[in-house]
Amino acid sequence: MKVRASVKKICDKCRVIRRNRKIIIICNNAKHKQRQG
């Protein structure tokens, strides 16, 4: 899980989700997991 100020989709399979006001990106590739901090 990477914590970044700006989160972007890295590949086509990345999906953007908003969970209680945090933007989270989940993907089949575990290296692409991100959340906004």
From Swiss-Prot:
Show the disulfide pairing.
none
The protein's predominant localisation is plastid
Cellular-component GO terms for this entry: chloroplast; ribonucleoprotein complex; ribosome
Keyword check for Zinc-finger, yes or no: no
Please provide the Gene Ontology terms (biological process) for this protein: translation
Query: What are the alphabetically sorted keywords of the record?
Result: Chloroplast, Plastid, Ribonucleoprotein, Ribosomal protein
Query: Which Gene Ontology terms cover its molecular function?
Result: structural constituent of ribosome
- Subcellular locations according to the entry: Plastid, Chloroplast
PROSITE patterns annotated for this entry? RIBOSOMAL_L36
Pfam families per record: Ribosomal_L36 (PF00444)
Could you say which protein family the record assigns here? Belongs to the bacterial ribosomal protein bL36 family.
Entry's NCBIfam families? Answer: rpmJ_bact (TIGR01022)
| Protein known as | Large ribosomal subunit protein bL36c
Taxonomic source organism: Gracilaria tenuistipitata var. liui (Red alga)
Gene it is expressed from: rpl36
